[in-house]
Amino acid sequence: MRTDMRGKDFVTLMDYTGEELQTILDVAFDLKRQNAMGAEHELLKNKTLGMIFAQPSTRTRVSFETGMTQLGGHAQYYSEDNMQRKNKETWEDTGLVLSRYLDALMVRLYDLEKYGMARDIMNEIRKATTIPVINGLDDKEHPCQCMGDLMTLQEKLGTGWKKKKIVMSWAYSDRVKSPGVPQAMLIACSLLGADLTLAYPKGYELDDDYMAFA
């Protein structure tokens, strides 16, 4: 099946089909193999990715910056402290202004005080921008980490990994942020036809919308 995702936001995996997710994985594996063989790419030459980290992350930041560099592009890091957000600029204005300079925008934002608030802000930014918006983790999903996890499953278990029984635990932790990782994995495995069992204790139930979708 031919897929065309040019200019499309990557905020929720619910906006994608299983074929589209598989295409993303196939392209990622191809680029990873070529990079391992020393091939150089300029697929994103003269392209700039803006990265808003309302909450910090070592791995997410390094992954995006390295990926942009390997593909010939450039990534810029922003926190709320070094943007006009600290002077009470709205998220809408922030997104509108940044879209005039950038080619894509990654946003990492979550707030456990009110579930869904981060996704509402993410959607506010999406509506204000004219460029693709990528979810680097909000309070509902972590789609990019999910795709990385799926790559690891295929690397370790082979191309027949979807026929394996996958068990994922979602449990107690000193640094619980959001249910974004298990909810994204739930959607991805459902779309790809994989068998996922999610184990969690009482009080860690997932969003009803995600359970219904899966």
Place the predicted regions along the sequence by residue.
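Generic, ordered loop/turn and secondary-structure boundary motif
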Residues: 6, 11-17, 45, 84, ...
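Positively charged, low-complexity intrinsically disordered leader regions
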Residues: 1-62, 66, 141
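Long, low-complexity, intrinsically disordered polar/charged segments
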Residues: 29-52, 102-104, 155-172
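Alpha-helical scaffold segments in soluble metabolic enzymes
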Residues: 23-30, 97, 124, 148-155, ...
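Glycine-rich phosphate/diphosphate-binding loop of Rossmann-like nucleotide-binding domains
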Residues: 54-66, 155-214
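Residue-level detector of flexible, active-site-proximal loop/helix-junction positions
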Residues: 17, 82, 140, 173, ...
